[in-house]
């Protein structure tokens, strides 16, 4: 049995208190607690506490400490239940305490995976223009349940997905100006897959791109790559030269007809 002999406020933190006790051998430092724990256990000078009571006090102090760490972590941005659990594990908090902290955070509505999923979906679709597949994968990695994700993605309509995908295409296609139209389409297709769009949405968007095909830019790309390969393969004669040229340009996405026209032009120049 110990008796509390003195309680004083810590100099560096007004919300924490040092508790001094006497176990029969004079006053000594016992432990420190948060103000919440001080009030919860009614700690005051003269109070007698046994080993069981002391164990409860120290356990609740650890819970409160972990709770405040979680609150601080949440102050930067919303987090999922799993993210909070992972954060506390990295802080070497025990599982029993983690469970209590998470339960309290859920009760106090500091964490809510449903709200998180809705806001995350809106941000990733409106700001980063990610497709549903990527958003779903990221939410699953954050521990959000399938049903919650399905609900959050309902407001991400197909029309909005097409709008976002077309914006991405418009931004990216400028960097493919020296590619053939076919190769540009393939690269844009790959980009949209990485961004998380469905095959259906990608097909619709690339069909719209087909209507915008620029013959002049296609010719510029053909001449750019054709002249580059011409310099590379001009050391070869006849059939070998033409075969290497055709293979190289075909791999770049140009049609046989386009390649034949280019080679004919080179023959006439020669």
Curated annotation (Swiss-Prot):
It is found in: Cytoplasm. GO terms for biological process: regulation of DNA repair. GO terms for cellular component: cytoplasm. It comes from the Bacteria. Its main location: cytoplasm. Pfam families: RecX_HTH1, RecX_HTH2, RecX_HTH3. Keywords: Cytoplasm. The keyword Cytoplasm applies. The keyword Protein biosynthesis does not apply. Belongs to the RecX family. Modulates RecA activity. This is Regulatory protein RecX. The lineage of its organism: Bacteria, Bacillati, Bacillota, Bacilli, Bacillales.
